[in-house]
């Protein structure tokens, strides 16, 4: 991923300091240690299986089907879920995990031979990727981090993993490795912060997706699918 550049940072910060009527503080600034941090108490001590139960229960509330399987059953589980969503066209990011999880033959041979088009995101194709996403019935991605408390999958966008894959198709499927499940956004933020400390380039676009698209008015009338997929499903892979 290309590292971005920051422009006019110094003049911007100097202007803020000037507006506050003081000089810039360039040293001795530290993150405070708060006496109370309740965000870490929620779901504290929950085992991996406990977090799966929390995730399953919340998926019911967000109108998202959760299918449990393992690496051996993932091929059939994904095939069946796409069928329940009325088939393709299918769009996927360029992600080596599809092959690692035993899905290459499904995506490159089996579905295409049955008349189900599969488009793999190609950075060199530019706008054509977005058109394919608009035409797709199902978008499939992996969840990088999964929040049990809210039933949220976290996606890291890149040149090979376009945001359109999970946004524009009519339906969406997230493949959720069990190892990706954490209690809540607190832990997800810690993971991202640690990546930064380790020198890992953080994506410019990080998406927190909680089931299908939802929108509500002041009278709390819920409408699904206004600005994203109408239906969503998570396939939990228990041995990953």
From Swiss-Prot:
Output this protein's name. Lactate utilization protein C
Xref: InterPro entries: FTHF_cligase-like_sf (IPR024185), LUD_dom (IPR003741), LutC (IPR022823), NagB/RpiA_transferase-like (IPR037171)
Physiological role: Is essential for L-lactate degradation and allows cells to grow with lactate as the sole carbon source. May also allow cells to utilize an alternative carbon source during biofilm formation, since it contributes to the formation of architecturally complex communities when lactate is present.
Mutant lacking the gene: phenotype: Cells lacking this gene are unable to grow on minimal medium with L-lactate as the sole carbon source. Cells lacking the lutABC operon exhibit little or no defect in biofilm formation on MSgg medium, but form small colonies that almost completely lacked surface architecture when glycerol is replaced with L-lactate in the MSgg medium.
Family, similarity comment: Belongs to the LutC/YkgG family.
What does the entry say induces or represses the expression of this protein? Answer: Is under the dual control of the transcriptional repressors LutR and SinR, which allows the lutABC operon to be induced during both growth in liquid culture and biofilm formation. Is induced by L-lactate, which relieves LutR repression.
- Gene that encodes it: lutC
Question: Which biological process annotations from GO are given for this protein?
Answer: lactate metabolic process
């Amino acid at each position: 991923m290309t590292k971005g550049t920051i422009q006019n940072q110094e003049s911007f910060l100097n202007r803020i300091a000037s507006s506050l009527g003081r000089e810039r503080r360039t040293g001795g600034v530290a993150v405070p240690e708060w006496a109370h941090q309740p965000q870490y108490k929620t779901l504290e001590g929950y085992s991996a299986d406990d977090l799966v139960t929390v995730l399953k229960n919340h998926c019911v509330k967000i109108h998202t089907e959760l299918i449990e399987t393992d690496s051996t059953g993932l091929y059939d589980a994904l095939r069946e879920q796409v069928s329940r969503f009325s088939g393709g066209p299918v769009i996927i990011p360029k992600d080596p995990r599809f092959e690692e999880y035993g899905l290459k033959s499904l995506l490159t041979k089996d579905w295409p031979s049955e008349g189900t088009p599969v488009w793999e995101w190609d950075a060199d194709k530019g706008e054509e990727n977005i058109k394919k996403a608009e035409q797709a019935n199902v978008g499939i991605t992996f969840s990088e981090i999964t929040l049990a408390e809210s039933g949220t999958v976290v996606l890291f966008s890149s040149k090979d993993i376009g945001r359109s894959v999970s946004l524009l198709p009519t339906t969406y499927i997230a493949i959720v490795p069990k190892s990706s499940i954490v209690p809540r956004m607190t832990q997800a933020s810690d993971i991202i912060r640690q990546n930064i400390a380790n020198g890992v380039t953080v994506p410019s676009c990080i998406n927190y997706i909680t089931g299908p698209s939802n929108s509500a008015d002041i009278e709390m009338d819920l409408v699904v699918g206004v600005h994203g997929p109408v239906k969503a499903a998570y396939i939990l892979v228990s041995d990953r």
